[in-house]
Amino acid sequence: MQVRWAPSDGSLGDYTYQQDMSSSDKLSADDVLNTLDKSNRHILTCILVCGLAWSPLAFTGLCPSFVVKASENSSFIGVADEFDLTGDASWLAESTTTFYMVGNMIGGMFIPPLADHYGRLPVFVATVLLMAVGGMISAFSTSIMMFCIMRMIHGIFYTAAGLAGWVLGYENTPLRLRFFTSVYFGVMWVVGACFLGLLAYILPDWRYLMFCISVPNIFVALLIYMTVPESLHFLVSSQQNEKIEAWLEKIRGPKGDISASDIVEDRDENGSSFKTLCREMWKHKMFIVYVLVMTYIWIVDTFIYFGLAFYSTNLAGNLYLNFVLMSLVEAPAYIFSPIFMNKYGRKVLISGTHIIAGLSFLGIVLSSEAWHIHFWLLGKFAISCSFMSIYMFASEIFPTDGRNKCIGFCETLSRFGGMLSPYLSHLTAVHALAPAITLSLIAVSGGLLTLILPETLNTKLPSTIAETASRRQLIDDKSDSSSN
């Protein structure tokens, strides 16, 4: 039996079912998932629970907005207040976020391979639990250095939990539900961010806040362990036939017509060795340009996104309301970005949203203070659209034989933008509008550089670096032939 799911019109999320019976054919894990009904309760539970974990992840990633140093007009007690980090020592408060981003880089490099070896589920559960423990211990820090170290540990497990949770949920999702899965994960992040603002209002002390935002991870980890199955893709790739049979019986029912022997591993995702990849890149210099441009865009988006999140509590007005509004504006970005990408193209959307963000920040410089919050919100919406889209764009630009390595390279280096983001507020010492001017210039530069990249809408995924490097010419040839 052969099962295929193909886009009926080239768009994401719109798939037509085609089945061709042939007993000699083998199925991939995706083929098996696509035979499941979209209302399958086990799959829906997996999606809902894995996405639910992103709410407490938002607690961890965005808590510096309050914990480090809240607005001077606020009664919130942050680490800068408790440890008297003022004057020449004020930089130590922001360094807690730098330590956190360093932890992100470490976790991103060393823990994902454990998920490939031991499984997505155990790594997901373990890292979520360790996040809870690390967060609760950090609430009892006796010095700023102890807090920095605990934040770095937090960062290590945050990245691993986020990646493992996303991969586990995505790999257990049929193709026709992956659009919904992407939107749901993003919305749950927004829900977590909004709850963080509410908790900070109720608990205006960094110790109480850190402890309370860490506890939910314990319950989430237990819920994951009790309800979420291991990734079928992982079980197939590791050839665990007994567990595959158990997975099939649980998810598809005891009377299913597919067995472990019918499923084969899709091996084209393993990619080339690092040495081979470097050799191919040297042959095709344009591909190196694509990697550098994509890395720069990733750094820009990380810097602006976290910079806005952390800086929102320094804006005029109620810091809690400002933070919640900055978070809520992400929800429509996560919902509409995939639609805009399929209608106007990846490059147009990402370049355009960077330009819109840049103009929004420029509007802050040119307008009265009453309009500032509106321009900040528009800028946050635009950069959230780009951040949502860049993962798909990168997956379609980078070829199969180097996709994981290239995306990992971009993701890791993007944390340098995260390291710099907490220092955005320090630019007010130069001029009150210096943060807005800086963000505007950086956003516009990212938008203009995006134009160097090839459009990937309605094109098949490249298999080799040579295909990616020549893609611009291929698209030009295709457009010329269609016009004739």
Curated annotation (Swiss-Prot):
Cited Gene3D superfamilies: MFS general substrate transporter like domains (1.20.1250.20)
Alphabetic keyword roster: Membrane, Transmembrane, Transmembrane helix, Transport
Cross-referenced InterPro entries: MFS_dom, MFS_sugar_transport-like, MFS_trans_sf
Domain of life of the source: Eukaryota
Subcellular location: Membrane
Topology within the bilayer: Multi-pass membrane protein
Transmembrane portions of the chain: 43-63, 95-115, 121-141, 144-164, 183-203, 208-228, 286-306, 321-341, 348-368, 373-393, 433-453
Keyword Membrane listed: yes
Record carries keyword Transmembrane: yes
GO CC terms of this entry: membrane
Residue runs in coiled coils: none
GO MF term set: transmembrane transporter activity
Main subcellular location of this protein, as a coarse class: membrane
One Pfam family, short name: Sugar_tr
Sequence similarity: Belongs to the major facilitator superfamily. Sugar transporter (TC 2.A.1.1) family.
Full protein name: Putative transporter B0252.3
Species per Swiss-Prot/TrEMBL record: Caenorhabditis elegans
Lineage: Eukaryota, Metazoa, Ecdysozoa, Nematoda, Chromadorea
